[in-house]
């Protein structure tokens, strides 16, 4: 393994990312921060990163999170089994670890661990980066059909739309909530979130509309509870049913 960050410690509190979502230089960074932040609040404290270009927003979001533990390895297959071991060792009801990979053959390398996770009922979250719809099926570098690549072994799957494409960032938040419910459920196993990203993949500035794209996430950074447990004006907890329905629609 290439290394592990020494400053981030996996704590029991769901600390928000330190950067303001609205001040992110581009929607990729904001969406990735929401996804990693939600996963952490839902119990995913370890993020195993295999370096790659398309997954840059996810890797940087994991590194930015002040309390997440980040493990780095250049071999996706080994990294996935490491994450599987974290999940098996965490005990019943734990969300386990996430694996972050780039697109293409990097994703295919996760299949052995996904099969093992399914057969042993162990939590394993697979966060894979992908090209946006217009680059699929075009012969673009490191592009394969990643939709439902793990077949029936995945207990949950969602193909998440590109940031800034019209769907609000809370769609990614509810997908994170849905995936971790499976990971922590009575019959855990692999959950797969396929994350589409357009350029720029790094922190380069690009015009976007925070007021439109972050609607429904007002106050998110100040909270430590998962997005699904938002509150009505009367203070009673509720499930974000409309967004959960949207996540289910993506998980087809």
Task: Describe the predicted segments one by one.
Residues 22, 26, 175, 181-251:
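Conformationally flexible catalytic loops at phosphate/diphosphate-handling active centers
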Residues 42-45, 65-69, 90-97, 119-124, ...:
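Short coil/turn connectors at secondary-structure junctions
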Residues 142-189:
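Conserved thiamine diphosphate
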Residues 1-5, 17-103, 247, 252:
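Thiamine diphosphate
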């Amino acid at each position: 393994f290439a290394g592990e960050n020494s400053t981030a410690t996996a704590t029991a509190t769901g600390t928000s990312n330190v950067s303001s979502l609205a001040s992110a230089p581009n929607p990729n960074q904001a969406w990735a921060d929401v996804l990693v932040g939600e996963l952490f609040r839902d119990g995913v404290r370890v993020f195993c990163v295999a370096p790659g270009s398309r997954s840059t927003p996810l890797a940087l979001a994991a590194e930015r999170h002040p309390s997440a533990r980040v493990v780095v390895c250049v071999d996706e297959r080994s990294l996935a089994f490491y994450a599987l071991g974290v999940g098996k060792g965490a005990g019943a009801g734990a969300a386990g670890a996430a694996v972050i990979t780039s697109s293409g053959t990097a994703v295919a390398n996760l299949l052995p661990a996904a099969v093992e996770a399914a057969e042993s009922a162990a939590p394993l979250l697979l966060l894979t980066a992908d090209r946006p719809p217009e680059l699929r099926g075009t012969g673009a570098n490191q592009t394969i059909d990643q939709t439902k690549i793990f077949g029936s072994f995945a207990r949950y799957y969602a193909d998440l739309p590109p940031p800034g494409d019209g769907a609000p960032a809370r769609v990614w938040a509810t997908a994170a909530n849905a995936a971790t419910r499976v990971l922590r459920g009575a019959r855990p196993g692999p959950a797969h979130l396929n994350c589409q990203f357009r350029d720029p993949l790094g922190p380069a500035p690009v015009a976007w509309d925070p007021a439109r794209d972050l609607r429904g996430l007002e106050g998110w950074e100040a909270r430590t509870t998962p997005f699904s447990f938002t509150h009505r004006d009367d203070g009673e907890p509720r499930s974000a049913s409309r967004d959960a329905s949207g996540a289910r629609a993506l998980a087809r």
